[in-house]
């Protein structure tokens, strides 16, 4: 197998009484997937949660829909990977009170507590057994790749879940550690919620384990809009690809993803397809973010790119070219005056000596150190006036403050500063 390909659906929200718009979209979805996959081998299909709407019936229509996707993609039911979402559980007063108590006291999961929370997924589990002819596992090992399934909805079920989901750490760890010896395989984690919906301390543990047990990227849904994100907290870059909704409504972006990965280079792409409601057809697009403006986004597995890192470390720096760049930048700068600049000059190494950062950031910082003497030489030369020297830090601070609230991570901040 040279390439790994998959279809990613999410939040399909079957309710049993769909109107024209939803039926029209779903029928067209099947046709579009058939068109895309007609001359390609698809290895698996992902449905990242919310199969039904508000714990509605897992009826014949839902079963027929999933079976049709399986048949179109020419895969077996064993290659259909599904996780539950917050709509796939039964909300009740007992669950609400239990969750409120757990979140308030941050208690350790006891056996009885976990069993009570599991009961609310009974209808979902029964349906999965019917559709796959087996009980659902958390880990599926296939030649060349592995699928790790997470029930991120385990502690969902209130109107205020975001940032409050709690990880059942023992169950999570017992399963993910089975990937410890899978360094040579591609390892994909699948859940319903973005990781940021967990408690902050749980987020850190999830990324640490993703890093230590060879997870390469994470597929999810829930937000009803296509998107992506990158995490470096665990020590290396792990992407998240967030599929949009599979149900037409007033605010959702209806999307599905097609993923492709070269198993030799460990590089590939994810293409997003968006449903146009008025035109009633599919087009490429629907993934938010500058890197996906063309409708597709590059997929690179950081864990396998050691040779690329070595090339960056050995890259020669053209000092004359870098000087010219800085001087051209300075000519275009709009000077910003500050009557009371509150800047306390410090040596750059002193500034960074006490900072805590992961290995990837530290490594990237060290590759940039070679530029510092050049920048100092320019800043201390007679080519810049005192006003110009003082303006540059103020401009950087000003532009940073402008975009700080509009970006979700450091990379986006830099991109927005450069654009401005």
Can you say where each PLM-predicted feature lies in the sequence?
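A short C-terminal boundary segment appended to hydrolase-like catalytic domains
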Residues: 261-409
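Active-site-proximal segments of metal-dependent phosphoesterases and phosphodiesterases across multiple
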Residues: 12, 154-217
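Conserved beta-sheet core of the metallophosphoesterase superfamily
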Residues: 199-270
């Amino acid at each position: 197998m040279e390439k790994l390909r998959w279809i990613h659906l999410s939040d399909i929200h079957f309710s049993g009484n769909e109107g024209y718009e939803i039926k029209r979209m779903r029928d067209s979805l099947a046709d579009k997937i058939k068109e895309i996959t007609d001359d390609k081998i698809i290895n698996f299909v992902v449905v990242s949660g919310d199969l039904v709407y508000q714990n509605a019936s897992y009826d014949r229509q839902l079963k027929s829909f999933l079976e049709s996707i399986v048949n179109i993609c020419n895969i077996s039911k064993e290659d259909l990977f599904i996780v539950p979402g917050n709509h796939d559980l039964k909300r009740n007063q007992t669950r609400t009170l239990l969750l409120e108590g757990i979140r308030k006291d941050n208690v350790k999961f006891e056996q009885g507590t976990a069993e009570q929370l599991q009961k609310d997924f009974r209808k979902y589990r029964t349906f999965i057994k019917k559709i796959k002819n087996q009980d659902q596992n958390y880990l599926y090992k296939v030649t060349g790749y592995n699928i790790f399934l997470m029930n991120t909805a385990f502690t969902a079920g209130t109107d205020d879940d975001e940032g409050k989901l709690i990880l059942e750490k023992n169950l999570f760890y017992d399963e993910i550690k089975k990937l410890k010896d899978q360094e040579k395989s591609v390892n994909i984690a699948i859940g319903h919620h973005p990781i940021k919906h967990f408690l902050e301390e749980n987020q850190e543990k999830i990324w640490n384990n993703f890093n230590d047990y060879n997870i390469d990227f994470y597929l999810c849904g829930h937000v009803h809009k296509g998107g992506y994100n990158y995490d470096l907290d665990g020590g290396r870059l792990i992407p998240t690809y967030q599929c949009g909704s599979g149900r037409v409504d007033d605010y959702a972006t209806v999307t599905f993803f097609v993923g492709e990965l070269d198993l030799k280079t460990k590089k590939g792409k994810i293409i997003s397809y968006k449903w146009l409601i008025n035109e009633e057809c599919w087009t490429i697009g629907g993934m938010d973010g500058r890197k996906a403006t063309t409708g597709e986004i590059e997929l690179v597995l950081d864990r396998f790119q050691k040779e690329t890192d070595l090339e960056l470390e050995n890259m020669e720096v053209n000092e004359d070219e870098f000087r010219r760049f800085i001087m051209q930048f300075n000519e275009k700068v709009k000077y910003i005056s500050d009557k009371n600049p509150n800047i306390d000059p410090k040596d750059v190494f002193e500034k960074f000596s006490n900072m805590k950062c992961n290995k990837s950031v530290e490594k990237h910082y060290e590759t940039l150190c070679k530029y510092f003497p050049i920048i100092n030489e320019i800043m201390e030369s007679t080519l810049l006036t005192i006003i110009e020297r003082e303006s540059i830090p103020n401009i950087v601070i000003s532009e940073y403050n402008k975009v700080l609230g509009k970006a979700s991570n450091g990379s986006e901040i830099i991109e927005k500063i450069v654009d401005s």
